[in-house]
Amino acid sequence: MNARADRAGDTVHRVPVLVVGGSLVGLSTSVFLGRLGVRHMLVERHAGTSVHPRGRGNNVRTMEVYRAAGVEQGIRRAAATLAGNHGILQTPSLVGDEGEWLLRDIDPGGGLARFSPSSWCLCSQNDLEPVLLDHAVELGGEIRFSTELQSFEQDPAGVTAVIKSRRSGEHTTVRADYLVAADGPRSPVREQLGIGQSGPGDLFHNVSVTFRSRRLAEFVGDRHFIVCYLTNPEADGALLPVDNRENWVFHAPWYPRAARPLEDFTDERCADHIRRAVGVPDLDVEITGKAPWHAAQRVARQYRAGRVFLAGDSAHEMSPTGAFGSNTGIQDAHNLAWKLAAVLGGWAGDGLLDTYDAERRPVAEATTARAAARSAEHSHPGFAPPPGTSGGPQGGILNVALGYRYPGGAVLGADPATPVVPEALTLAGEPGSRAPHLWMSRRGERLSTLDLYERSPVLLSDADAGAPDAWHESAVRLAEELSVPLTSYRVGRSAGADLTPEDDVNWTARHGTPPGGAVLVRPDGFVAWRSQEPVPAEETEPTLRHVLTTVLSLG
């Protein structure tokens, strides 16, 4: 990939951002950039979206960012078939023994509604990617399937890449300000950049087998699980429903290091393995597809190299247990997209892009460890955990999915000693944490505070204070002075309020700021800063100027 990109005779195609890779993370990057008005091109070597049902667990934070991007409802429609499936079951077979529920419900007490307007969604990758693709195209994304990156070079002003159509063989030179590599765990972009990885490496190998069985639903009964770990030592595996009727996925352990070739997984052997695992010798099984895969625990040693950024599996690999992998990648893309938009739009400095690594890499390091610990706990087929893995920190799944924090980066006032994943889920307005969810009324419209955060930084200030307009007026002046698209809302119950909290909620207390205080929230919904003590009216403008210029790396 080191061939020179400025080949004579090529027409140069210019875009601000080139996205390499068009799976979940690449398509999500396209959607997020499109929402922010950033012109871009996405290239994907495969002919279309995924055809294999994998990567199905979309956690609540992922659904929040899809909500902000206007795509949540389309995803839920695509996921309607499995909307009633909950929990993780472990059992020796589906006959006789009811089994043990390792996790009966992600939100058994309904307490998640206190923290989020969204919820988990079980949508397989082959159903999710077409929704993202349609949305990306509607937003103006230039999506090129059957197109691969041949080479790229970067200089202080941008990236020059050569892409090749796998259909026509035609080469095109692309000149971009930035390149986002969402090109998978074997990332050629990462390899060319010479970026190493940390972590123990490969954890286990499986073969994913899709099959049809009309009778299997009889033995599953009303146990509508997300996944069932079948623990027959002679034929273990993980069973997942596709439609709860006749289409299923079975993950069988594969031991390539034991010289067991992939060719051993014939249709006949796979069908026999499934029958023994389920406990029904005469079960009807029609194999429809097979795909090998491996789980690993690796994190890239850096996420940025000049004008190139790693996202998704190119940046980190983790065990699928807990459904953290694709979710972490999608949230990488969400973190990066607004920063690229800000720098390209001229309202943030280049230093803001350095915070992508500072924020997202510690999250991946913490999450990969917890994913491996969950694989050990759930005895994932084929996983022989290294010593000490099962004793690693896990935390509640919501703490990992929703409660993670950025102790450093584009935040001001965060405690650098704060663990990335907290012991308890609070979301109480701490800088570096996802901003609190509160229901508000705006001119008769009901909305979550999270619905306010996408296209610009947002300042929330107290409309019921002694000087209710001080923060707001300072924000308006600074937006013009600094050319920052800062949006300001006065929150309270007075006549001048822009937003009114529901149910007598004390919004300042929920955000951890005093009466008369203010909170700055980033476009990705994370708290950038909050006032910790009362600020005199005449000090609001210099205070806010310092916050904005620091967070956005201006000046």
UniProtKB/Swiss-Prot annotation:
Transmembrane segments: none
Binding site for FAD: 16-45, 303-313
Region (Disordered) residue spans: 366-395
Keyword Oxidoreductase recorded: yes
EC number: 1.14.13.-
Disulfide bond entries: none
Enzyme class per UniProt: oxidoreductase
Keyword Oxidoreductase among UniProt keywords: yes
Pfam families: FAD_binding_3 (PF01494), Rng_hyd_C (PF21274)
Entry cofactors: FAD
Family to which this protein belongs: Belongs to the PheA/TfdB FAD monooxygenase family.
Protein name: Putative polyketide hydroxylase
Species in which this protein is naturally found: Streptomyces halstedii
Protein's gene: schC
